[in-house]
Regions:
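Active-site-proximal helix-loop-helix substrate-binding element of RNase H-like nuclease domains
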Residues: 1-23, 63-66, 70-172
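DnaQ-like (DEDDh/DEDDy) 3′-5′ exonuclease domain used for proofreading
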Residues: 2-53
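Sparse, context-dependent recognition of short Cys/His-centered cofactor- or disulfide-binding micro-motifs
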Residues: 53-55, 105
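Short consensus segments that form the blades of beta-propeller domains
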Residues: 56-60
């Protein structure tokens, strides 16, 4: 994206009605420039109601991405794109993500990369950089762990957990 396109995107985002979210969290007002970061983490929130019964919905076009969490350096962002209220403009968010992910010099970190990459590809986003998957790496570090989910790993290795109150209020 050019700087003019980013400026227009910022204005579009500022014009969005965020809705009433009972939380300290609010969606970002701008899309960050992550060009200076070598490693970027991405986690998708999806609505995939038939996942347990039929497998990932991305291959059947059954379900959709509802939000995109991105972290780089000490910063993190969440971009709601298909919640009930408070969404950011979908097209510019996915255009930004497409531009970001086509950078072959970057490393992208996922948890359960196969699942998230399937959803990204279904949205037309191809990740061209190196891919690292914490779900694959975790048992290599400790094969005797009881749980390998992202929340357990983040708690044990980073001392942080999901903010359930914030997640519930953002999802409403």
């Amino acid at each position: 994206m050019t700087s003019d396109q980013y400026h227009l995107l910022e204005q579009d985002i500022k014009d969005v009605a965020w809705g009433n979210i009972d939380s300290d969290w609010t969606p970002p007002e701008t899309i960050p420039d992550l060009s200076q970061y070598d490693t970027i983490s991405i986690d998708l929130e999806t609505r995939d109601e038939n996942l347990l019964k039929l497998g990932p919905g991305w291959c059947r076009k059954d379900g959709h991405i509802i939000g995109i969490a991105v972290a780089a350096g000490e910063s993190s962002w969440y971009f709601p794109v298909a919640h009930t209220v408070g969404n950011m403009p979908r097209r510019p968010v996915f255009q930004w993500l497409t531009d970001l992910c086509k950078d072959t010099t970057k490393t992208f970190v996922f948890h359960n990369a196969l699942y998230d990459l399937g959803w990204l590809r279904a949205e037309g986003v191809e990740v061209k950089g190196k891919i690292r998957d914490t779900m694959v790496a975790a048992p290599l570090l400790n094969e005797n762990r009881r749980y390998y989910n992202l929340n357990s790993l983040a708690g044990d290795y980073l001392g942080t957990y999901k903010d359930e109150k914030m997640l519930k209020s953002a999802a409403e």
